[in-house]
Swiss-Prot record:
Belongs to the GrpE family. InterPro entries: GrpE, GrpE_coiled_coil, GrpE_head. The lineage of its organism: Bacteria, Bacillati, Bacillota, Bacilli, Lactobacillales. This is Protein GrpE. One of its GO terms (biological process) is protein folding. Participates actively in the response to hyperosmotic and heat shock by preventing the aggregation of stress-denatured proteins, in association with DnaK and GrpE. It is the nucleotide exchange factor for DnaK and may function as a thermosensor. Unfolded proteins bind initially to DnaJ; upon interaction with the DnaJ-bound protein, DnaK hydrolyzes its bound ATP, resulting in the formation of a stable complex. GrpE releases ADP from DnaK; ATP binding to DnaK triggers the release of the substrate protein, thus completing the reaction cycle. It is found in: Cytoplasm. The gene is grpE. It comes from Lactococcus lactis subsp. lactis (strain IL1403) (Streptococcus lactis). Residues 1-20 are annotated as: Disordered. HAMAP family: GrpE. Transmembrane segments: none annotated.
């Protein structure tokens, strides 16, 4: 081989090595760029996933609250009607207390009263307890001194009955309380 041919082969080898080094550096740069882009894409995907999870949880909460409100509306649907019927029930009670009613009239009034009470009970309306004074369900309209027969905080007399629908108070009982 001639000197020139040897020199050409040597130059080709050097060119190949330089090209190989450049290609390796370029590949490393490209790989690094791709890794950075992938990291950004993963961050973006994680961010969108978190947003999706938050929105999904919020939707579940909205549905749950809507269901709870619907159940409350169903549970207390008869509240306004019950409040209006209570005054009629009071009037029936007053009418039954009148002296001189004939037995037929009295029996008719009692039947109407029982019918109203039964209808209210079916809807969940119940009379409040009168065992001892509870400011949550009773309204003290008068107090009397406590004695042996009526200890302190006991209810001496009920002026007007109180009612509740499930656990919600419709009307407090108006009572006389021993102090």
């Amino acid at each position: 081989m001639s000197e020139e041919t040897k020199e050409e082969i040597k130059n080709e080898k050097v060119d190949e090595e330089v090209t190989e080094e450049l290609t390796e550096e370029a590949l490393e740069d490209i790989v690094e760029e791709e890794i950075n882009e992938l990291d950004e894409a993963q961050k973006l995907a994680t961010e969108w996933e978190n947003k999706f999870l938050r929105v999904s949880a919020e939707m579940q909460n909205v549905q749950r609250r809507g269901n709870e409100e619907r159940l409350q509306l169903i549970k207390y649907r008869s509240q306004d009607l019950a409040k209006k019927i209570l005054s009629s029930l009071d009037n029936l009670e007053r009418a039954l207390a009148v002296e001189g009613l004939t037995d037929d009239v009295k029996k008719g009034l009692e039947m109407v009263q029982e019918s109203l009470i039964s209808a209210l009970k079916e809807e969940g309306v119940e009379e409040v307890s009168y065992e001892s004074f509870d400011h949550n369900i009773h309204m003290a309209v008068q107090t009397v001194p406590a004695d042996d027969e009526h200890p302190a905080d006991s209810i001496v007399q009920v002026f007007q009955k109180g009612y509740q629908l499930h656990e919600r108070l419709l009307r407090p009982a108006m009572v006389v309380v021993a102090q």
